[in-house]
UniProtKB/Swiss-Prot annotation:
Disulfide bonds: none annotated. Keywords: Isomerase, tRNA processing. The gene is truA. It catalyses: uridine(38/39/40) in tRNA = pseudouridine(38/39/40) in tRNA. It comes from Thermotoga neapolitana (strain ATCC 49049 / DSM 4359 / NBRC 107923 / NS-E). Substrate binds at Y111. It holds the Pfam family PseudoU_synth_1. Its EC number is 5.4.99.12. Formation of pseudouridine at positions 38, 39 and 40 in the anticodon stem and loop of transfer RNAs. Belongs to the tRNA pseudouridine synthase TruA family. One of its GO terms (biological process) is tRNA pseudouridine synthesis. Signal peptide: none annotated. This is tRNA pseudouridine synthase A.
Length: 245
């Protein structure tokens, strides 16, 4: 039996997150339902990231064991897309080594977060960017972001329910202006704690509003206490953009 991987994009608006759960609509659930229709047996998948409800993906990576040796990777891609709903699309299918695991073999994960700063709401962006109609100091945010790059204990930026090792490495944070009304925060790292990126975004916004000095993020990081940080940015502005492996 061969092992294949797929790059998947999805609109997370109508999903209760990526990970399969009983009685609710999840991305993993609809993918495995589609695979069952194709191969006439339950196929279990693994993924590079478990996005929360409302979070989108441009480049989620999944892998599974394929019981059909005759289908080409293009055949598998086409069959999956024919059986998936409109808010999920398989961009590419390719073969990987039999022991490949997307969660453990990925070297870098990249997340994008979009903030729409126009004074006027755009109803077409309401599910795809955080509408935040206030001026943000991007230079101050960039200075603050530097304190988060590198290997640190990110306890202050995780949810209380995440019991994993809080030490994580952020390779780079970029804060870009996309025209006058859209800001992109790009976070690159090996792996992330639950809601870590959204909690980082909320803290950077505090700096952008000049409610915190950039150096405050160093204090928050060193506190290793979730209550020392800001809130959590909304899910719908976040995209699991890409993985490198």
């Amino acid at each position: 039996m061969r092992r294949v991987a797929a790059i998947v994009e999805y609109d997370g608006s109508n999903f209760f997150g990526y990970q399969g759960q009983p009685d609710v609509r999840t991305v993993q659930g609809v993918i495995e339902d589609a695979l069952e229709r194709i191969f006439k047996q339950r196929i279990y998948t693994q993924a590079a990231g478990r996005t929360d409800a409302g979070v989108h993906a441009n480049g989620q990576l999944i892998a599974f064991n394929c019981p059909n040796d005759r289908m080409t990777t293009e055949d598998i891609k086409n069959a999956m897309n024919a059986n998936l709903p409109d808010d999920v699309y398989v961009k590419k299918v390719f073969e990987v080594p039999k022991n490949f695991h997307p969660r453990f073999d990925v070297k870098k994960r990249i997340y994008h977060y979009f903030i729409h700063t126009s004074r006027e709401k755009n109803v077409f962006l309401r599910k795809y960017a955080w509408w935040f109609p206030y001026e943000l100091d991007l230079e101050a945010m960039r200075k603050a972001a530097k304190y988060l790059e590198g290997t640190h204990d990110f306890t202050s930026f995780k949810t209380g329910s995440d019991e994993r090792d809080p030490v994580r490495t952020i390779y780079r944070i970029r804060i870009l202006s996309l025209g006058k009304d859209m800001i992109l925060i790009r976070v690159e790292g090996r792996s992330f704690l639950r809601r870590m990126v959204r909690n980082i975004v909320a803290a950077l916004v505090k700096v952008g509003l000049r409610q915190w000095e950039p150096e405050k993020l160093k204090e928050v990081l060193e506190a290793r206490d979730r209550s020392a940080a800001a809130g959590t940015a909304p899910a719908h502005g976040l995209y699991f953009y890409k993985v490198l492996f």
